[in-house]
């Protein structure tokens, strides 16, 4: 299990990688079509259709701009300084520069949290706490969307980035324990055989209180 110094290193090196490769990342992802993911989250948010959305790990701001163009109030959260600056410039939205492991979020504030290709960077021992913080920042009944590269619960470094590659059952256990109920899940890209769909997307609704245990050792027990 990583110690506090190791967690600091994990965050610092991952953010440094993104800062060093910010322009290449933007060029490689700016035209990605994630409209399926955006629609999947918005479909389940209840209430007047001008929602307050937290784009958790907003990167250079592609999806912030998309939410704004759909008429929603979008706020970005990004740990990498270069991404945060790019997101502000590209989207015109407010962007909070925060490390995922050192969050400072308002309570009961957002209708939806859009975590597209981001939560897999959170070490498994810290994931229960981070999910509880996302639960708390949502309004009651609010919606969490996540999409992560899937695997068999491997955890470690891959091309300069730290990641955890959960399978569906493990991911369900973590998110359910943090006080969410699953609404739907699917694999991406659409229309391909399952073995060619590396992304697991899922949509969750916030319950009033977390139901599960906060001990990550018990969360991962079979």
Name the predicted role of every residue range.
Residues 154-170:
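Acceptor-substrate binding/catalytic loop of class I
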Residues 2-59:
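Conserved class I S-adenosyl-L-methionine
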Residues 190-221:
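Core SAM-dependent methyltransferase catalytic element
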């Amino acid at each position: 299990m990583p110690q506090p110094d190791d967690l600091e290193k994990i965050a610092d090196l991952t953010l440094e990688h993104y800062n060093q490769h910010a322009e290449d990342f933007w060029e490689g992802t700016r035209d990605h079509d994630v409209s399926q993911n955006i629609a999947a989250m918005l479909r389940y948010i209840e209430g007047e259709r001008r929602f307050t959305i937290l784009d958790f790990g907003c990167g250079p701001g592609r999806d912030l701009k998309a939410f704004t163009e759909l008429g929603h109030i979008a706020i970005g959260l990004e740990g990498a300084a270069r991404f945060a600056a790019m997101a502000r410039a590209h989207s015109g939205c407010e962007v909070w520069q925060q490390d995922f492991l050192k969050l400072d979020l308002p309570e009961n504030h957002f209708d939806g949290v859009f975590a597209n290709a981001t939560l897999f960077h959170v070490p498994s021992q810290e994931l229960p706490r981070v999910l509880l913080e996302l639960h708390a920042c949502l309004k009651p009944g609010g919606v969490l969307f996540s999409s992560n590269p899937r695997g068999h619960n491997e955890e470690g470094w891959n091309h300069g980035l730290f990641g955890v590659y959960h399978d569906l059952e493990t991911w369900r256990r973590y998110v359910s324990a943090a006080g969410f109920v699953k609404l739907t899940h699917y694999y991406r890209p659409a229309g391909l055989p399952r073995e060619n769909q590396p992304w697991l997307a899922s949509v969750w609704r916030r319950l009033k209180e977390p139901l599960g245990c906060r001990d990550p050792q018990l969360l991962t027990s079979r």
